[in-house]
């Protein structure tokens, strides 16, 4: 991953790097890989995430339709 440093502005480059890493999901992946996760735990976590995503999409859809 690359970030351009313009006018020796390292703070701005760091901010851009963090934003890119956040979008790519690197921080989330690092957090998940700190400890081994059993395959059964992974399946349960992914299923729970899918349920949360579905509920969120349904809420957004209802909000758009005005219900």
Curated annotation (Swiss-Prot):
Ribosomal protein in keyword set: yes
InterPro entries: Ribosomal_bS21, Ribosomal_bS21_CS, Ribosomal_bS21_sf
One Pfam family per UniProt: Ribosomal_S21
Domain of life: Bacteria
Keyword Ribonucleoprotein recorded: yes
Annotated GO biological process: translation
GO cellular component, as recorded: ribonucleoprotein complex; ribosome
MF terms (GO), sorted A to Z: structural constituent of ribosome
Keywords: Ribonucleoprotein, Ribosomal protein
UniProt similarity note: Belongs to the bacterial ribosomal protein bS21 family.
Protein name: Small ribosomal subunit protein bS21
Native source organism of the sequence: Granulibacter bethesdensis (strain ATCC BAA-1260 / CGDNIH1)
Lineage: Bacteria, Pseudomonadati, Pseudomonadota, Alphaproteobacteria, Acetobacterales
């Amino acid at each position: 991953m690359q970030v351009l440093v313009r006018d020796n502005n390292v703070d701005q480059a760091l901010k851009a790097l963090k934003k890119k890493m956040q979008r790519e999901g690197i921080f989330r992946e690092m957090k998940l890989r700190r400890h081994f996760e059993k395959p059964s735990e992974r399946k349960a976590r992914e299923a729970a995430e899918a349920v949360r995503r579905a509920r969120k999409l349904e809420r957004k859809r209802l909000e758009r339709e005005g219900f």
